[in-house]
Every structure is written in structure tokens, then in C-alpha cells.
Amino acid sequence: MADQPNPAPPKPGLKRRWLFVILAMTFLFVLMPFLFWQATWFGKPLNDAQLQKSLVDREHPREIQHALSQVADRMLARDTFTRDSARQFYPQVVQIAQNGQDELRLTAAWVMGQDNSVSDFHQELLRLLQDPNPMVRRNAALGLVRFSDASGLAEIRSMLQPSAIGAHEAGALDERLKPGESINPGTLLGHIRSGDSTSELRSQIPGTIRQWLVPDKAAVTKGQPVLLVDPSVGEMWESLRALYIVGQLEDLPAIENIARGAGEVPANVRQQAELTTTAIRSRQPH
């Protein structure tokens, strides 16, 4: 048998080159989650100068959100010096609540609820009860509870009830999601087609789709309710905690229904409902 030719030896740099490629890819898989974490995590401390700069960075709303979160962290700090250092940024917080985008007004409302000694915060939260965004209104209502102000009681109650989502314009509705699916603020629910144009129907609230109120492909008018959404667990939890303080006798049927475990209610929410029921009853004259 004739000798078979020996295979050509590998090029000297081939193994090393592949090693570098593998190491580089491994590094990227580690690096990318870290960079993403850096971009989305609001815990990175900011000094005073960075906070001042970020709070007015209108081109980067996420920087403003980061700064607002840092102001709240200072407000909640244990030591007096750190808490007092947050006060210099209070005027910017109010300004953002008045002029910011939806996400910024929502965050500002949450921040203002952390210090119930500031009358400007109290007044601004009252104004935000009329905000067009339901999540801003809800955060404002919850924040007012910290001021022992029940002006947002209607909003707090609504967080325990199904919410209707209306069509933002007239046209034919193309439904995208089905009953039972969870949604969050910004979730794409469907499209509305009007002539040659198509617009997106998105949710402003979290929850679970209970039912569509109109058939798929049906013609809808602007403002017409098209979808019914059950509240999210988080919304129910926050509402019950607020009602613990400002709830009234007329709130008991809905709260006791939750305490009995109606629907798929987690144990901690049922427990909070029981505590809230007890607190409301204890405030009634005997």
C-alpha cells in the first residue's frame, strides 16, 4: 500500500488566533451584562455636582431618573447629614414633576412622597392628582397618604378595581394580546388602523387582561373603552397599604373579598388585606 501523504501541519498562529477569539467572546459575554447593568441600575452613587448636572439633562431622561432615585436615597438615609443634603435638590424635583415626561413625573411623584415635611411637595402632589397619566396620579395619591391627606382616595380605590383602556383615536382595532396575559406600562396591546395610517395602542398601567370589550377588527371611536384590565399584584399591595391608613368602611367589601382569596391572590396580599380590614374597623367609633 502506498504511503498516504501526511496532513499539512497547522499554521503556527492558528490555535493561538482561535484562543484569542474565544477569550474575546468570553470577555464580551461577561462585559455586556455589566455594561447593561451600569446603564439600568439606579444605585450608582452620584455626588452633588453629578446630581445637579443629571437633574437638568433633558436629552437623557434616564439620567434624570437616576438622579431622582439618588435624591430619594438621600432622603431615606439614616444619618441627618445625608438626609439634609437632599434638600438642595427639592426645587428641581418639583420642576421635573411639572414639566417632565411621563416616566419622570411618575418618579418625581414617588420622590416627593418620601418627605412629608415639605409643603411644596404636598401642593405639587395634589396637582398631580389631575395628571393625564394614571400611574402619575396613583403615585401622587400614594404620596399624599404620607402627608395624612386622603385627597387621592379615589385613585387608591381604583387600584383594586379593573381598569378600562380606551382607544386613543378612531379606526379599526387589531388586537394583539389575549385575556389572561400580563401587561405593563408601555406594553403593545394592538393597533388602530385608520385609512392608510396605523398607530399603536399601548398600556399605561400594569395588570392582567380580563377581556376585550369590542371584537377584533371592529371599528372604534376615540375614547371608546376597548379593553378591561385587572390590577397587578403590586398595585393591589400598594393600595391596601395606603387604605390601612386612609381607608373607610365603604372600602371593606372590596378589601375583604381580597382577604378571602378571590382570584389568584398571593398570600402576602391576602394578609395585608386582613391587616387593612382590622385597621379600618379599629378607627370606627364603638
Which residues does each PLM region occupy?
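Hydrophobic membrane-insertion alpha-helices, especially the h-region
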Residues: L19-Q38
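Amphipathic alpha-helical scaffolding segments comprising HEAT/armadillo-like alpha-solenoid repeats
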Residues: W41-L55, A77-Q98, S117-Q130, D149-P162, ...
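Short inter-helical turns and helix N-cap capping residues of alpha-solenoid HEAT/ARM repeat scaffolds
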Residues: E59-H60, G100-Q101, P132-N133, A164, ...
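Conserved hydrophobic register position within alpha-solenoid helical repeats
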Residues: I64-A67, A108, A140-A141, S239, ...
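Core register positions within helices of long alpha-helical scaffolds
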Residues: Q70, V111-Q114, G143-R146, A242-I245, ...
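Short histidine-centered loop motifs in beta-beta connectors
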Residues: A167-S182, I209-D216
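Short hydrophobic beta/alpha edge segments that flank linear recognition/processing sites
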Residues: G180-L201, K217-V233
